[in-house]
Amino acid sequence: MYHVYLLSDATGETVERVARAALTQFRDVDIRLRRMGQIRNREDILRALDEVDRAPGIIFYTLVNTELAQFVRNEVEARQLEAVDLITPLLYKLAEFLEMRPQKLPGLQYEMNSEYYRRMEAVDFTVKQDDGQEPRNLHKADIVLIGVSRSSKTPLSMYLAHKGYKVANVPIIQGIDPPGELEEVEPERVVGLIIDTQRLVDIRSARLRNLRQSPRGSYADYRQVEEELAYCRRFYRAHPAWLVIDVTNKSVEESAAEILSRLHGDIRHD
């Protein structure tokens, strides 16, 4: 059985309709929907996510309060859960199209100005450059993150993008050469991510369990992960001008702050 959790700050009818419409494309699958409405504060969110922890599944949520929506994003990242925000991207796009501020976003204080459009442009760029896509655009990135699978490249990229940085991320895979364009990027813009072996094994194992796959394969095997990280470190040592940070047990916010601090503000946007 697959669990789908529906979080809403109202009755939850809207998020359920969207979820059911999407699920019609997946027949003959045993799916349990769990609707959690009236999510009004952080305590409500924590109670809901504790339930998800006990029976992992995917979360769909519609929270018009942007502070609560951000709190959900932070928590699901920390807990290694899968979640989809169904309303915030839509509201941003409508606000951009209509040149109006949404009426029911009490936490949203942005103005429709060049700063807002620049940040949205950064997000669009970052999405298109995720996981090594379109390497020809690496030279356009403010920051290029590199690292092995599940080392926080994507969540870090998106967090930085929402701060206005154009970010690309490139996977480091043992036995496969990274794109040649990476060597052409100014070294002060490249950040290598490293992580503790056991921590990465735990993250990958949790990922496999969420996908209903066995964690016993090579992807989460301690020795294999150790070899991947050793290969990654050797690759970083061959590029001493690159910044390398350890993301072990750090939140996305902490890792992002370290990256921006250690880059000495050369590409500061805030």
Curated annotation (Swiss-Prot):
Q: Name one GO molecular function term.
A: ATP binding
- Name of the protein in its database record: Putative pyruvate, phosphate dikinase regulatory protein
Annotated positions binding ADP:
G147, V148, S149, R150, S151, S152, K153, T154
HAMAP family in the cross-refs: PDRP (MF_00921)
> Which reactions is this enzyme annotated as catalysing?
N(tele)-phospho-L-histidyl/L-threonyl-[pyruvate, phosphate dikinase] + ADP = N(tele)-phospho-L-histidyl/O-phospho-L-threonyl-[pyruvate, phosphate dikinase] + AMP + H(+); N(tele)-phospho-L-histidyl/O-phospho-L-threonyl-[pyruvate, phosphate dikinase] + phosphate + H(+) = N(tele)-phospho-L-histidyl/L-threonyl-[pyruvate, phosphate dikinase] + diphosphate
Record has Nucleotide-binding as a keyword: yes
Primary enzyme class: transferase
Q: Which domain of life is it from?
A: Bacteria
Q: What is its EC number?
A: 2.7.11.32, 2.7.4.27
The keyword NAD is annotated on this UniProt entry = no
Task: Give the protein's function.
Answer: Bifunctional serine/threonine kinase and phosphorylase involved in the regulation of the pyruvate, phosphate dikinase (PPDK) by catalyzing its phosphorylation/dephosphorylation.
What does the sequence similarity comment in the record state about its family?
Answer: Belongs to the pyruvate, phosphate/water dikinase regulatory protein family. PDRP subfamily.
Q: Which UniProt keywords apply?
A: Kinase, Nucleotide-binding, Serine/threonine-protein kinase, Transferase
Note the Pfam families from the entry.
Answer: Kinase-PPPase
- Protein species of origin: Citrifermentans bemidjiense (strain ATCC BAA-1014 / DSM 16622 / JCM 12645 / Bem)
